[in-house]
Each structure stands twice: as structure tokens, then as C-alpha cells.
Regions:
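N-terminal Rossmann NAD(P)H-binding glycine-rich loop of SDR-like oxidoreductase domains
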Residues: 1-21
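Adenosine-cofactor binding site in Rossmann-like domains, unifying the SAM/SAH pocket
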Residues: 20-44
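NAD(P)H-binding glycine-rich loop region in Rossmannoid oxidoreductase-like domains
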Residues: 39-76
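Active-site "gating" loop of Rossmann-like NAD(P)-dependent oxidoreductase/epimerase domains
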Residues: 60-63, 68, 101-121
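NAD(P)-cofactor binding segment of oxidoreductase domains
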Residues: 68-96
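NAD(P)-dependent short-chain dehydrogenase/reductase
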Residues: 133-180, 186-194
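Mid/C-terminal beta-alpha module of Rossmann-like enzyme folds, strongest
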Residues: 191, 198-250
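Amphipathic terminal alpha-helices
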Residues: 275-296
Length: 296
């Protein structure tokens, strides 16, 4: 059996859907059964049965709230990955861990490489960075995959927010000076399963540190415009996008201005390239509109 944490999140739900289609034995416990903030809960759940691999998609992702809740963020994002990695090392099984662009400052003018120095701006990024360090401190066979700007038909995310606001407003102000690559959770899940499957079947496959986002780059405003375009084409709600600067939208945690991740290593080592982000957005918006139509 393969243990999946974070099964109710965007990537977790996408992984479960794909694993079911591929008959992969993924087990996703509820938070009551496995609390990543509680080392005793983690130890007790791990002891329930033998595991063939662990996929850690669980995280404390409330970026702004983390500034006031550092202890909880660090327990889930740093403590838990270290504990899971130690278990994987002791039992000689692979670990697949999801990380984030927030480990970087965003000051670099070009896309970030896996080898670039980390310099997180806030508590969330710091806690995720510590999680990576904790995993690498063990000798476990781990693949750490950093991603950014995750969206999907599931949970809370930027595309769903834009679609909701478009029903309520004629225009929406969106930040236009933060750059990144939107990543569809279903697309990312497909890539993660390729890595997981190979690590399961090839004990010599070492893992490593990788970046994975959909191909291409844009700004939050650019992403919002694409969402509105696709929605309007399909008869859904649409609003005019008004570009603003980061300073006009203050948040508790500072955001990286540059969240672009260079994904060349993923292609070189695994033969994986995620499709262009506009195609992903078309599928995501279409799925959301179909869901709304089914509910109305």
C-alpha cells in the first residue's frame, strides 16, 4: 500500500482520481486518522501496516495565516516531512514530497533552478524550506518536487476565485507584477505518478530535487484574463480585469515577485514536460462550468 497525505487537497484529490484509474493502491487517511501536526499520530498511523511508498502532498498552505501560526506551520511543513523521511529511510521505501516556489525570494530575474540558493520571504516558505532540509538530512530515497500557482476544479484556488468574482462584479483588480507558471493539479499529479511508479519499480532510481509547473509563464492578471476569455467563450461569467501593483494589494506575508521555475531537469531525468498553461486553464474552466451547470 502507498500512503498519501493531503488527500483532500488539490493535488491529493487529483492523485487519488488518477491512482484509481491506474489501479494504484493509494491510501489517503483523514486528518483525524493522521494528523501531520502531531508526531505521535504520524507514528501510530505508520505502524498500522507495511507501506511500499509515501507521497507527502499534505501541507499547511495558508500563507498569510502562517505569519501568526508559525508553530503549526512548522510542525506540518517541517516536522512531519522529517519524520516521514526517517520512516522511509528505516524501511527502505521511496518518499515523494511536494514543495513550493515560496522557498525562493523571487528576486532572481530569470526562472529558478533547483541549484539556486533558497531565501524564503515568510513563515510558510521558511517552514517548507526546513521540510526539504529535513528530508535531505536523511539518507532516504526521496524525490522533492517544487511547484507553483496550483489551480484545479478542486478546493480553494485562484481560478475558482476569479470565476466566483466574475458572477458578482463587472471588473476585478488583479496583481500584474508577480510572474509565474500556473500549474494544474491534475497535470502535476500525472507527473508525480510517473516519478512514483518508476521509484517503486526501480530500487536504483535515486529521486532528487525537481521543479514542475505547466509550460510557459504569465502574471496573475494574465491568468485572470485567460480565465475570463475561456469562460466567456463557453457562456460562463466574465469580468474586465484591471491590472494593479503588488503594493495596491497588501497581504500579511510577502509574495515572491518571480515564481518562475526552470523545469528542464524534470524533462532531462524523467522525460516529463507539462503542457502549456493556457491549455490547462481551458480544461479547468470548462470543468468548473460543467460542474456549475450540473448543480443549477
Amino acid at each position: 500500500m502507498i500512503l498519501l497525505t493531503g488527500g483532500t487537497g488539490q493535488v491529493g484529490r487529483s492523485l487519488l482520481a488518477l491512482a484509481q484509474a491506474q489501479s494504484l493502491p493509494l491510501v489517503a487517511p483523514t486528518r483525524d486518522a493522521l494528523d501531520l501536526a502531531d508526531p505521535r499520530s504520524i507514528a501510530a498511523y505508520l505502524a498500522r501496516q507495511p507501506w511500499s511508498a509515501i507521497v507527502n502532498a499534505g501541507a499547511y498552505t495558508a500563507v498569510d495565516q502562517a505569519e501568526q501560526d508559525q508553530q503549526q506551520a512548522e510542525a506540518i511543513n517541517a516536522g512531519a516531512p522529517g519524520q516521514l523521511a526517517a520512516y522511509c529511510q528505516d524501511h527502505a521505501i521511496p518518499l515523494l514530497h511536494l514543495s513550493t516556489d515560496y522557498v525562493f525570494s523571487g528576486d532572481k530575474p530569470s526562472p529558478y533552478l533547483e541549484t539556486d540558493a533558497t531565501a524564503p520571504l515568510g513563515v510558510y516558505g521558511q517552514s517548507k524550506c526546513k521540510g526539504e532540509t529535513a528530508i535531505l538530512a536523511t539518507a532516504c530515497r526521496a524525490a522533492i518536487v517544487r511547484t507553483a500557482w496550483v489551480v484545479s476544479p478542486y478546493g480553494k484556488n485562484f481560478i475558482k476565485t476569479m470565476m466566483r468574482l466574475a458572477q458578482q462584479r463587472e471588473e476585478i483588480q488583479v496583481v500584474a507584477d508577480q510572474h509565474g507558471s500556473p500549474t494544474g493539479a491534475p497535470d502535476l499529479a500525472q507527473a508525480l505518478l510517473v516519478i512514483l511508479t518508476r521509484m517503486l519499480h526501480d530500487p536504483q532510481c535515486p529521486g532528487g530535487l525537481y521543479h514542475a509547473t505547466n509550460h510557459g509563464e504569465t502574471t496573475w492578471a494574465g491568468l485572470a484574463r485567460k480565465v475570463m476569455q475561456v469562460s466567456a467563450q463557453r457562456g460562463g461569467p466574465s469580468a474586465r480585469i484591471v491590472e494593479i501593483g503588488t503594493e495596491a494589494y497588501p497581504t500579511a506575508a510577502k509574495r515572491p515577485k518571480n515564481s518562475r521555475l526552470n523545469c528542464d531537469r524534470l524533462q532531462q531525468d524523467w522525460g516529463i514536460t507539462l503542457r502549456p498553461w493556457p491549455l490547462m486553464v481551458e480544461d479547468c474552466v470548462t470543468a468548473l462550468l460543467n460542474e456549475q451547470g450540473a448543480q443549477s
